[in-house]
Amino acid sequence: MFFSDHGGVQWLVVFLGNPGLKYQNTRHNAGFLTANVVEKDCGVHIDRLRFHALTAQAELGGQKVLLMKPQTFMNNSGEAVAPAAKFYKVPPEHILVVSDEIHLQPGRLRIRTKGSAGGHNGLKSIIACLLSLIHISEPTRRVVIS
């Protein structure tokens, strides 16, 4: 089930990790491991290659969501996220990124709506690519990240 292309998705949920068996059960693949649980619990298969990512569309909580597992390496995750956000016209505030966090104990969760990448290269890549899209498409718009 794929929603109508442009504007058919309201949210992006991005599960960060590194592709390949070598990284399968490493800390950096916390996002991919979480995606596996979501697949099982929601009965979806994140397996359609699109935007340099494995993707699936789902309706969660009445919202149309694109689930993504970028197939770029962690440091280049923005190369998958930005084109999807642009294609579906999803604003940055509707992008949820699931990643590892070295400052949290396993099993702990933190949700942030503001802040920096905190040294996480995958988040840095996503922020940089999204800012690049904003500056290209809306050169007069000012973006502040605090």
Residue ranges: model-predicted function:
Residues I134-S146:
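Single conserved hydrophobic/aromatic residue that forms the stacking wall/gate
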Residues A117:
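Conserved TIR/SEFIR loop-to-helix hotspot centered on a Trp-containing motif
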Residues F2-K114, L123-K124, A128, I134:
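Nucleotide and nucleotide-moiety/phosphate-recognizing core
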